[in-house]
Amino acid sequence: MKNLVIVESPAKAKTIEKYLGKDFHVLSSVGHIRSIVKKTKDGTPPIDVANDFFAIYEVDPEKKKVITELKKNVKAVGKENVWLATDEDREGEAIAWHLCKVLDLPIETTKRIVFHEITKDAITNAIKNPRTVDMNLVQAQQARQVLDRLVGFELSPVVWQKVPGGKSAGRVQSPAVRLLVEREREIMKFEGNSQFKVTAIFIHDNQEFKAELNQKFDTEEAANEFLNSLKPAEFIVSDISKTPGTRNPAAPFTTSTLQQEANSKLGFSSKATMASAQKLYQDGKITYMRTDSVNLSGQAIAAATDFIKRLYGPDYSTVRKFKTKSASAQEAHEAIRPTDITLETASNNSYDQKLYDLIRRRTLASQMSPAKLEKTTITIDIKGNNLPKGKKLAQFEAKGEVITFDGFLRVYGGNKDELLPKLQSGDEVNSHDITARQTFTRPPARYTEGSLVKKLEELGIGRPSTYATIIDTVQTRGYVEKGDSEGQPRDVIVLNYNGEEVSRSIVQEKTGSTRGKLIPTPSGELIADFLTDHFTQIVDYDFTANVETEFDKIAGANLEKSAMLHGFYAPFHKLIEQSGGIDRSKVGANREVGIDPKTNKPIIARFGRFGPMLQLGETDDDEKPRFAPLPKGAKIETVTLEQALEMFKLPRIVGQTEDGQDIKANIGRFGPYIQVGKLFVSIKPEDPHSITLEKARELYAAKLEAEAAKNIAEFPDGVKVLNGRFGPYITNGAKNVKIPKATDPKTITHEKALELLSATTAKPTRKRVVKKATKTSTKKK
C-alpha cells in the first residue's frame, strides 16, 4: 500500500478502491468526525464570542475507533501520501479540514480531490488534478454551524421557559413553520362561493365529445333558467380554429427539483428521496445529489445525444445547454444525471430504481426535441333558445389537442390525445346531455413536501443540502404533521337537461383532503406567533435568505466569517437578554368555551405542557380541574362547547372483557386508546366515543397475544427476558441488558439472567428537570 484515500462513506470506499487499484487503500470517516462540544470541562463557553467566535471541537465518541484506524494507516503510508476525497460541498470540505486537524495533516499541502460522479474516469481525473483544502468553503460551513448552534443554544431555553409545550427553535426551520402557519390561516379565513358550470356532451357521426359553456351562473335559478331555454334550441358549429404549438422539456434535476418531482410523481418524502439518491451516488449510478446547477458536462450531453439518435432517430435529438438562474449556483458542478445514460436498471431496490428511472428519463428528455402539438377549438352557437333579450350570448367551446410529434414526451410526461370529430363550420351537432354542476372556489392549497421545497428555494431559504433536514426537523419537533384525512363530504347541486326536461339532484363530493399535506400543529402555530412577536429576525424570510447569501459570500472569499457572525449575533443576543420580561401567561391566550351545564363550571381551551387542551373548572377552585384533549382538527380559537362537552364524556366504559374487567375508552397524548387494568391499547383510527365492545375486545385480545410473544421468561423476583424492538434483552425494571447474539434467549435461566445483569454497569437515569410553574388563574382574558 502506497497511498491512503479517505472518503465519507464505507459504501463509496469499496467502489473507489476498485477503480484505483492496488497502490491505493480507501478508508471512510463515516461522515463527520468532530462537532462543537456541548459542555467544556473548565466551564468556558463552547463558542467564544469575544474571540471571533472561536469554537471548541471534540471527536464524536462513536468515531474514536474510526480515528484510531485512520491514524494507524496514515502512519503506514506517510502524511504526504494521504488523499482527502470527502464530498464536494461545504460539509465535505469541512470534514476534510477536521481530518487534517485530527490526523495532524498539513492543511497547506495535503492533497484534496473532488469528483461529482463515482466512475473510473472521474476518479482517475481527480487523482491527476489534486488541490488543497479550500478554507473559504470551510469558513462558510463553520459560520453556518456556529450560527445555528448559537441560535439553538440561546433561543431554545427561552422557548422552553416561555412557550407552553415549546421544544426548540432553529434559524432555518422556524421560517418554514411560519410559512405553513400563514398558509393554514389563509385557508381558515377563506370565504368561498359557488357558481354553476355548464358542460355538454355532443354527438357527431356517432362520436361523442365534450364542450363547456363560455359563461358561468352565480345562482341555481340562473342556471335552471338557461337550461330550460334550450328546449327548442339547435347547436351549430360557428367556428373552428387550429393553432400549432410546441412543448419544451424541463432542465435536468437539481436537488430541489428532484425532491419536488419525486414527491409529486412517486409520493416520496424529501428524506426518502435523498436517501435513495445517496445510495445511487455511492454505487456510482448517478452524479452528486446535492447541487443547485442544471448544467450538464459536454461529455454527458454527447453521450445522451448519441443514445437518443441510436434509439429514436436524429429527429428526436436537440442539444441544449441549460443555465442556472440562482446566483449562488456553482456551474462547475453538474445537475443530477446518470453516470451511464444507457443503463436502464441501476438497483434491485424498487425505491432506488424508481428514482433512478425518473432521473434518467428527465436527463434524456432535456436533450430531446420539443413536442409538436395542434390545438383545436370548436365554437358552437345556440340557435333558437328562448332566453330573454339582453342576456350575454352563450356559446359552447370544445377543445382538443393532438400530438403531431411526441419529441421528448416519448420518454417523459407523455399525454393522451384529446380528439375531436371532423367538423365544418355550419354543421349541426346533437346534444346528448347538458349539465349545470355547482362548483366551489378553492382555498389556497396546503403545502406538500415538494411544494414547500419549491417555496423555500424561491425565498432563498436553505440550500440543496438542507431542504430534507428542514422538513424532517419540523415534523420531529411536533410543530408540523402530515395530514391523513380524505376530506369532508359536501352536497353539490346538479341540474341536468336531457333534451326534454330539466331535473335536479344532489350528489356528494369530498372536499378539504389533507392526505400527504403538511399541516402546522397548534404547537407550531404557537411557536411561530411567539417568534414573530419577540424574535422577528429569526422568522423573517428576507433576513433568513440574506444570511444564506452571506454564507455564499464567505465561500466566495467576499466576506469575513467573523464580520458576518458579529453582524448577526449582536442584535440577536440583545433580544435574548430582553426575553426575561416576556410574560409566559400571555403566550398562547386562554379562551372560555362555555359553561358545563352539569357542574356550572367554565370550560377553558388553553395550552398545556403537551399542547392545546380543555380544562373544566378553575385552577384556583378547591376541587381540582379536569382536563381533556382538544377534538382532532379543532383549535383553541374554534372549538365549540358541544365538542368540548363530548370530550369530557371520556373516559367511557365500553363494556367488560370476558373475565369481567372494565374496558375504558379515552384519548391521550398519543391518540385514542382503551385501557383494561394497567394495559393500554391504541385503537387508532377508531373513535373512543363510538368504538363497539366487539371491536374493543378484538383489539384487547390482539394486544394480549403480542405481549405474550414479547415475554420469553419471567421470574418470581420480577426479572424478565423479553423480545424488544432491537432484539431480546433482560430487565429487572431498573436496568436493561442486551442478550449476546450467540445465546439463545429461551435457554436463559434465572441464575444466568442475574449474572448478565450484575456484569453490566447500569447507565445513570437522566433526571427530568420539572419546571416550577407559577400558579396562575385561567380565567377568561
Predicted ranges, named:
Residues D218-A251, Q259, Q424-N430, R437, ...:
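Metal- or metallocofactor-binding catalytic centers and their adjacent structured scaffolds
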Residues P10-A13, V30-I36, E88-G92, H116-D121, ...:
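Conserved nucleotide-binding/hydrolysis micro-motifs of P-loop NTPases
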Residues E261, K265-S269:
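A conserved hydrophobic secondary-structure block that centers on an alpha-helix together
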Residues M1-Q145, E154-L155, N214, G313, ...:
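Intrinsically disordered, low-complexity regulatory segments
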Residues V237-I240, N248-A262, T287-T291, P443-K455, ...:
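Short acidic, hydrophobic short linear motifs in intrinsically disordered regions
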Residues I118-F202, K242-T246:
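C-terminal or mid-to-C-terminal helical accessory/interaction module adjacent to the motor/catalytic core
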Residues K2-N3, T15, V74, T132-V133, ...:
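Basic, low-complexity terminal or inter-domain segments flanking catalytic cores
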